[in-house]
Amino acid sequence: MLYGAVGFSLMTPLAYAQAIPAAAKMRPKVIVLTAFPPEWQAWTVEKSFQHQVLHVPGLIKPLICDSKDVCVTETGEGEINAAVTVTSLVKDAALDVKKTIFIRSGIAGGVDEENSALGSVYINNWVISWAFGHHYLSDQKQLAWSPPGCTDYATPGHCGNYTRNIMENLAYKINPALLNMAVNASAHVALENSTEAKKLDKTFAISAVPKVMVGATITGNDFWIGKANQAIAEQIVRRYTHGEAKYTNTAMEDLGDVAALSRFGLADHYLSIRGISDVDVPPPGKTEEEIWKTGDLYASALAERNAVIVTEAVIAHLLKGTA
């Protein structure tokens, strides 16, 4: 197991300027990272998380915890907010997170593939950067992408090493042992569904039955949509994982989470669990511009709920290992 039995002691919120004895530090077993109010509220409705509230400098919301040392916070949207939050948690004098499992739990954009119903949940095996490299308009006036130059991210002779490189954050492979545990823990969960989601599934001609799957998530701060960008996302994931992973969902925070953890040697303590709220291409008969004018089609509430269901199953399994 990645952590042993953990003690839990109440602390006054602000002894940050003073050295805190190691025995007095709070040691969360799990910290769930949410991005924005609907994801946060999907957890805060559970009164168990009012057992302890810790105000951590650098966080936009407090760290709220239950009696089993499982905590939740809201990071804000995007890679920068995610990285600032995770760094603040790791460096806070009142916390010891050396054995904590960090789980990003929230919604994501999915793909228009038959088996990827809205409300499905991906336990991600890779976290990939959308932004690095070169996004441009080709001579044929098509959206295009090329990878960063080798000297931008790698030491000489290691141009193919996109993973955990020393100069840019391009790709992180999730700890296989932690990933397998999460997949096994959620193998028999019952996901919810909704009439709204089923209608959208029919619109996109995809499955109407949400399921738990494994795939790669790509992280970027800009909201994009369309077949051209989808093809670029697929290209990036293939390149950075050497064909090992398949692009299945897109979100805004995960790379910031795991890159920050990596700086402290904690990248192997990270999971990304994402519920599919929308599809990354317009519905048939609609253009990208029409979507910007009218708004995308979402099943956000279902995606949030199912992400929580899977995350709770994973947490329950983790806690069994510390009993």
Label every PLM stretch briefly.
Residues Q18-A323:
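Accessory terminal and edge-of-domain segments that mediate assembly/interaction
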Residues M1-A15:
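N-terminal export signals
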